[in-house]
Amino acid sequence: MRLTPDVLMQAYATGIFPMAEHRDDPDIFWVDPLRRGIMPLRGFHMSRSLRRQMLRTAFDIRIDQDFAGVVDGCADRADTWINDEIRRLYNILHAQDRAHSLEVWEGDTLVGGVYGVTLGAAFFGESMFSRRSNASKIALACLVDRLLDGGFALFDTQFLTEHLASLGAIEISRAQYQKRLQEACARPASFLNPPLRSPQEVVQRITQMS
């Protein structure tokens, strides 16, 4: 039986998420890590070099302008867990306003971005990509600012990578994650309501919070 978007959202509500072994594998399996990566929304680490680049950049930040393009960018690597079924499901969730992308543009060219799923005040980050230096870091900084502004309480990164840890992400136990997840899912939040801010404005806001 084919997986439906509603079943996928029920899975997120219980703390599990889907992956495929590789892009050509038609099957999907469920993942429930013993240790979960999260990004504390008030703990984003912005290095001096990233701050300088964001203050000087000509990149534009856009929301949901090319969701499918962001998913394609995330899958455009030698080894990816994003197969055709995952593309299908998340494009449906996007059409239902349950999955969103934050995009980094250079003129008319999409050069980076991140996409994920929203449920209550929880944001489940799925994947990100970069075609310019630090474009994914800029996307994450702008995403953290947007989630804070929209009333989100949980930014789930699934796993803790070295890249995410350098930006302030941490790892918590499954039990700790479940508690935070249930609290976040019970709260309202909005991904689309906050105003769109430039990288320069985001630097100022994050600096004021640190």
UniProtKB/Swiss-Prot annotation:
Which reaction(s) does its UniProt entry say it catalyses?
N-terminal L-lysyl-[protein] + L-leucyl-tRNA(Leu) = N-terminal L-leucyl-L-lysyl-[protein] + tRNA(Leu) + H(+); N-terminal L-arginyl-[protein] + L-leucyl-tRNA(Leu) = N-terminal L-leucyl-L-arginyl-[protein] + tRNA(Leu) + H(+); L-phenylalanyl-tRNA(Phe) + an N-terminal L-alpha-aminoacyl-[protein] = an N-terminal L-phenylalanyl-L-alpha-aminoacyl-[protein] + tRNA(Phe)
Listed GO molecular functions?
A: leucyl-tRNA--protein transferase activity
Give the Enzyme Commission number.
2.3.2.6
Biological process annotations from GO: protein catabolic process
| One GO cellular component term noted in the UniProt record for this chain | cytoplasm
- Which residues are listed as membrane-spanning? none
Q: Tell me, what does this protein do in biology?
A: Functions in the N-end rule pathway of protein degradation where it conjugates Leu, Phe and, less efficiently, Met from aminoacyl-tRNAs to the N-termini of proteins containing an N-terminal arginine or lysine.
Q: Which family does it belong to?
A: Belongs to the L/F-transferase family.
Q: Under which name does UniProt file this protein?
A: Leucyl/phenylalanyl-tRNA--protein transferase
Gene encoding it? aat
